[in-house]
UniProtKB/Swiss-Prot annotation:
PROSITE patterns given in the database record: GLUTAMATE_5_KINASE (PS00902), PUA (PS50890)
Name of this protein: Glutamate 5-kinase
GO molecular function: ATP binding; glutamate 5-kinase activity; RNA binding
Pathway membership: Amino-acid biosynthesis; L-proline biosynthesis; L-glutamate 5-semialdehyde from L-glutamate: step 1/2
Database matches in Gene3D superfamilies: Acetylglutamate kinase-like, PUA domain
GN (gene name): proB
Group of enzyme by EC: transferase
Organism of derivation: Bartonella henselae (strain ATCC 49882 / DSM 28221 / CCUG 30454 / Houston 1)
Similarity field: Belongs to the glutamate 5-kinase family.
Amino acid sequence: MAVGLQKLVHYKRIVIKIGSALLVDPQTGLRAEWLKSLISDVANLHQKGVEILLVSSGAIALGRTLLRLPKGALKLEESQACAALGQIELAKTYSDTLAQYGLKTGQILLTLFDTEERRRYLNARATINVLLRFGAVPVINENDTVATSEIRYGDNDRLAARVATMMGADLLILLSDIDGLYTKSPHRDPTAEFIPFIASITSDIEKMADVAHSELSRGGMKTKLDAGKIANSAGTAMIITSGKRMNPLAAIDRGERGSFFAAGEKPVNAWKTWISGHLDPSGILMIDQGAVKALESGKSLLAAGVVAIEGRFNRGDTVAIVDTNGVEIARGLVSYGKDESVRIMGRKSEEIESILGYEARSAMVHRNDMVLRCLTDSA
């Protein structure tokens, strides 16, 4: 068993991400027997009181297989048409397979806007909570039929992490075609070393990410590490393990290889959980070392500590706060739009009113609207 990982039955709520390459064979379509073995594991955990949420890729891959489309990249509208065709087949298969074990399922299709906009986020969370209360197994996917490049997650690793943080899951399982994190790509370099335990995702860990993509999957190791950072920021543990074997959840409990990412400290409230999980900040505030120390001690970010600003944002948008080396220190909701922020950056709080012409907040990002990232630099 991966270092730090408990038996799955000891977790109260688990999100499981299933990759396209595991679920869909490009020649034959759905891997029905493999899926049945996974659902058998899910049913076993469900019977023991563990709440399971499935984040399933595969709609586009299944659709293009059903249409017998040739290899190669698809146009956006072609991908969306494949998703429309594949999603209905995928939902039916999940429903039929879960029903064999006496379980019901509910389909949830999300776009990025559904988790980044607060009201929609709360509504999605409430709906999924009711499904769980009814004893159903939610099956969640990105709504590929309508999502454009501007409002898409881009991969289901990040979607799964966002769902895990939104739902307060104890554990996120990424079932992949690789059994964990390596120092290098094991497919290309035989000297690659396996890493069983990751205390925090540092810059050195991120350098190990394999950015390779396949036609059936939009993800790679980089997106899995992105998912790990999202999960970590909300106090959710994560494991990356191979899903190629039958009964992949039982395999985890048997001790098959996987990389375990320790959970970070949970945010103090639901508001900060929502902020911490934002995937695409609208802008970046670069701050000096004095401001870094102030944030670490629990203070708000003042304009005086800001040395550079990037992006386009309005008041209330999410921004990333980075040090002068570009390392993200925190994420929060900014008190000013881009133009006003540029005018007051580097200035003392008592100067802001005279610069802007009205009485304004002294904090560019208030501590109540901010979540610190993990600042350690050792794995």
